[in-house]
């Protein structure tokens, strides 16, 4: 049997028996491997030992259950901790905050399924990050997880290093090089921009002080969208000076046409909608300006200090695409974060209109760009549905985006 399938069996066994005592013998019995060999494979595929991985999963499942009516002490005991105090210490050590602060501050989502057969999924432990820090003379800094302030999910590719820096890592050197070009990077001791460690590449950037934009804030004060629109335009003006040959060239229309039949079946789209999409968007696509864009302007990638905009972050996905894409993606990302709370269309419409108005204050959008906005928004959802539907861990996101696409078709 393929090694990955064997490790996937262990991953599923751990989740299915998360409240039971799981011994090293049990895991070795499932795999037929020695524990030393199993540890090596776990580190290779998941970036952690089996015991480290099990502890993290127990903590995540336990804090998820704390949204219910069962007492914290009982939940801690059910997940293998002798006392709540022991659970508390383990949780704070792993996530950098107390369980109560976590459940109060972040959405209580069930831990998603991890399937290494479907996609690369590398969990880099804080211990490994700590070992890298001497390369930057930051060995005395505390490594802390970065938590999405809207979803409560931990970042899968970055950590805070002390209070002043952010470390990012990836197996994709191209993504790392984009950030080197667009962020303020801290050089290594040998003056290199990034560190290669096995298949992973690491960089450290100076932290932007402030907080991720919270969807509740922009829903309560849609004028924030004016500020965002202005700063998207300012970012685009800066990005015009970069050589587009250094970045991927993308065509959102072609991407959607390639996925439309699949999404049509998944979302039960009408022939009328699909034909109109192909004809009207197809006739406009060549009239739209393209340039280097951010590509991932979602609330967690916008840093604010109160109402003052500080910066966009995370340029992993930057590419050459439609200029209007960033505005449309920002609007759909905000909608996605609050969609299950039955957002009022009039509020969301005000947000997207303010994004456009803010952008126009700095750089005028063309008549064709304004006309094509609904189709770019539909396109973003079509691409998201096609992507998310491939992975188990995004099952709920697939359903949400299908509902969003239908809602958008009806309203926009």
Model segments located where?
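Sequence-specific DNA-binding recognition helix
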Residues: 23-31, 35-42, 68-103
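Conserved NTP-binding catalytic cores of kinases and kinase-like/nucleotidyltransferase enzymes
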Residues: 118-190
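Active-site acidic catalytic loop and adjacent metal/ATP-binding pocket
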Residues: 150-163, 167, 279-325
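Active-site activation/catalytic loop segments of kinase-like enzymes and analogous catalytic loops
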Residues: 324-363, 378-394
